[in-house]
Regions:
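Short amphipathic alpha-helical segments
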Residues: 13-39, 73-82
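Active-site-flanking beta-strand signature of metal-NTP-handling nucleotidyl enzymes
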Residues: 2-8
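Hydrophobic pocket/interface hotspot
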Residues: 5, 17, 55, 65
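Glycine-rich beta-strand-turn "strand-cap" elements at beta-sheet edges
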Residues: 6, 35-54, 76-100
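Short amphipathic alpha-helices within nucleic acid-binding modules
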Residues: 15, 60-73
Length: 100
C-alpha cells in the first residue's frame, strides 16, 4: 500500500520546510528500527497550486502503518519535529491518500 501526505506550506517557508524534511525519515529509522519500511520520499509540487509538499511511503498493510504511526507518535523526538514543522504549515494535511 502506498501512503501520501500532502501539506500546504506557508508562503516564505518552503526553504525551511525543505531543510526539515530530511529529518523525518532519519528519525523514523531511529524509532522504528527494523520496522522502518523506507524509503520515505519528499516531493515539492512544481505544477498546479504553489506551496505544496508531499511525503510518500509504502507499507504492507494499513495495520502495519498504524502500528508504525503509534510508535512515532509516542516518541518525543518525533513530536518535536512535528511541532517545529507545524509552524511553517497552513494546514496540517490537506489530503491523505492511500493506494492499495
Amino acid at each position: 500500500m502506498q501512503f501520501n501526505r500532502i501539506m500546504n506550506v506557508k508562503p516564505g517557508s518552503m526553504d525551511k520546510v525543505m531543510q526539515m524534511a530530511q529529518k523525518f525519515p532519519e528519525r523514523a529509522k531511529e524509532v522504528l528500527g527494523d520496522d522502518y519500511a523506507g524509503p520515505v520520499k519528499f516531493m515539492v509540487r512544481v505544477h498546479g497550486p504553489l506551496n505544496q509538499v508531499k511525503w510518500q511511503w509504502e507499507r504492507e498493510s494499513m495495520d502495519a502503518d498504524m502500528a508504525a504511526a503509534m510508535k512515532l507518535n509516542n516518541d518525543s523526538g518525533w513530536q518535536a519535529l512535528v511541532a517545529d514543522l507545524s509552524e511553517h504549515m497552513e494546514s496540517s494535511s490537506m489530503g491523505d491518500v492511500t493506494w492499495a
